[in-house]
A protein has these predicted regions:
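Active-site-proximal alpha-helix that buttresses catalytic centers in soluble enzyme cores
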Residues: 2-81, 93, 107, 117-122
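Structural signal for conserved beta-strand scaffold positions within catalytic alpha/beta enzyme cores
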Residues: 5, 73-75, 129, 144-147
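A glycine-rich beta-strand to alpha-helix segment
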Residues: 95-115
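A polyampholytic, Gly/Pro-enriched intrinsically disordered region
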Residues: 91-102, 142-152
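Residue-level preference for the first positions of well-ordered beta-strands
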Residues: 3, 96-99, 127
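Conserved ATP-dependent adenylate/AMP-binding module captured primarily in the ANL superfamily
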Residues: 86-88
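Domain-level recognition of soluble alpha/beta enzyme cores
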Residues: 118-141, 147-151
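Short, solvent-exposed polar/charged micro-motifs at secondary-structure junctions
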Residues: 82-84, 152
Length: 152
């Protein structure tokens, strides 16, 4: 199976609660670029997303290109959640190509758990693609990566 981990696009400054922060126009463009890449190169069959607004907005770019792919909100993939707990829930998802849209630092920690490597930060709207027989710590291999335009 393929697991595609995606960080949300650029979000507005912290002028509202973290869970309510919106994507900037630039962040929308980043999410669109990454969604185009995913749909062009992979065939996602299930989306999992954080409940936070900016992750939901990022997922919307994917859903506009793959409207028949089911999606579910997973409450424990917000920025400071425990990656072990999140991975335990993700392990129950039945999919051949799973896309998970979430945040730093949990996205880096999930990638680290999957491969057994040290955590590495994700750029805004970056995706990393992993292959594994099943979801379990240390069992995945990173196969691909895409980074859209960045603001710096």
């Amino acid at each position: 199976m393929k697991i595609i981990l995606m960080r949300h696009g650029q979000a507005e400054d912290e002028t509202r609660p973290d869970s309510a922060r919106q994507l900037t126009d630039y962040g929308q463009q980043q999410a669109a670029q990454t969604a185009d890449y995913i749909i062009e190169h992979y065939k996602p069959d299930y989306f999992v997303v954080s409940p936070y607004d900016r992750a939901q907005q990022t997922l919307a770019e994917l859903q506009s290109r793959a409207p028949n792919v089911p999606a579910t909100v997973q409450d424990n993939i917000t920025p400071s959640d425990d990656a072990h707990d999140a991975l335990a829930v993700l392990a129950n998802v039945e999919a051949e190509c799973l896309v998970v849209v979430c945040h730093m630092s949990i996205v880096a920690n999930l990638a680290s758990l999957l491969t057994g490597d040290s955590p590495e930060a994700f750029a805004l709207a970056e995706v990393r693609i992993f292959e594994t027989e099943f979801i379990m710590s240390g069992m995945a291999t990173k196969k691909d990566r895409f980074v859209p335009m960045q603001p710096y």
